[in-house]
Amino acid sequence: MHKVLAIETSCDETSVSIVSNSGDIYKIHSNIVASQIEDHSKWGGVVPELAARKHLELLPFVLEQALEESKIRIEKIDVIASTVTPGLVGCLRVGSITARSLCTLYSKPFLGIHHLEGHLSSILFSKNYPKPPFLTLLVSGGHTELIKVGERRKMQRLGRSYDDAAGEAFDKVGRLLGLSYPGGPAIAKIAKKGNASKFNLPKCKISDKEGGFLKYDFSFSGLKTAVLRLVEKINLNGDEIPIPDIAASFERVVAEVLVERTIKCANDYGLDNIVVVGGVAANDTLRKMMISEACKKSIKVHLAPINLCTDNAAMIGAAALYRLKFKAYESSLKLGISGRLPIDQANTLYENKPPF
């Protein structure tokens, strides 16, 4: 059994977790998350410099609380891991330097973890998670991707958003409608009072230069613009904006686009298991629609636990534990951080010559 201390500071959550595994059973001993939503809500989104400063302020206390709650002394930890890519560079640096400093101080191995692999690994804390190969829909504030996951974490990106990620579109539309930040939960809440069929919003596609459309890729910028034009038109007519109806219609279209393209991709590639992870995976409309539509194709859906959909260190620890199963992974203490790295290059974080 391995015990991992994991740190996540890629955006606006400061999180430390102690996790372990016994074979294929993964356990969370502690998972402390300090959110910065109140600090950023007044600006309508994350301010990178402010986020990095808050990580510096909060991380020592979050680390202490995680160790105390787990009742595991740091000397008993086998590996220390942190998110090193992708994310906000200043934020990543805080967590990475802290993790590598602890490794040096306590003579522990270090594992740099890809943030998206962390999200992907959140499913390991659910019951009966699938064995590879399977298709993952990773849908969050910064990313919307379809990833085929093979043995030993061989990953192939099959689809992605070419502009706004789904979560980013939720935030922008929420702000447009005068709702609180973050937009995802705010839209989901008010949409329950609305008519999801009231407005016929577009399901945008990406043109293929060879003709037709890219069938597994996403675009949410046009949908966001359509909502803007709708609001402008209603304002021009002097009518009251039906916020619940617009929110419900927007939420429905986002869910339909995600579900339709995910199921088509899984069906085309002969994959009978779909995993849904990331912050937007907490959306109830998306969860129910994915299960319902996948069932029609005899595809099984595995949903990340609600409390592990948004950024947290437990998922980073799970990714580290999964890597340790192969007994061949350790990152150099010279490994830096990077704002971007495609998920299919995650294995380079454990090579003798680090990618950054």
UniProtKB/Swiss-Prot annotation:
GO terms assigned for molecular function: iron ion binding; N(6)-L-threonylcarbamoyladenine synthase activity
Listed EC numbers: 2.3.1.234
Keywords, in A-Z order: Acyltransferase, Cytoplasm, Iron, Metal-binding, Transferase, tRNA processing
GO cellular component, one term: cytoplasm
Origin species: Prochlorococcus marinus subsp. pastoris (strain CCMP1986 / NIES-2087 / MED4)
Cofactor(s) recorded in Swiss-Prot or TrEMBL: Fe(2+)
GO biological-process terms attached to the record: tRNA threonylcarbamoyladenosine modification
Stored InterPro entries: ATPase_NBD (IPR043129), Gcp-like_dom (IPR000905), KAE1/TsaD (IPR017861), TsaD (IPR022450)
Domain of life: Bacteria
Protein name in UniProt: tRNA N6-adenosine threonylcarbamoyltransferase
Function: Required for the formation of a threonylcarbamoyl group on adenosine at position 37 (t(6)A37) in tRNAs that read codons beginning with adenine. Is involved in the transfer of the threonylcarbamoyl moiety of threonylcarbamoyl-AMP (TC-AMP) to the N6 group of A37, together with TsaE and TsaB. TsaD likely plays a direct catalytic role in this reaction.
A Pfam entry, by short name: TsaD
Gene, per the UniProt record: tsaD
Positions that bind substrate: L138, V139, S140, G141, G142, D171, G184, N283
Subcellular location: Cytoplasm
Iron listed as a keyword: yes
Alphabetized HAMAP family for the sequence: TsaD
Cofactor note: Binds 1 Fe(2+) ion per subunit.
Family: Belongs to the KAE1 / TsaD family.
The organism's taxonomic lineage, starting at the top: Bacteria, Bacillati, Cyanobacteriota, Cyanophyceae, Synechococcales
Annotated positions binding Fe cation: H115, H119, D311
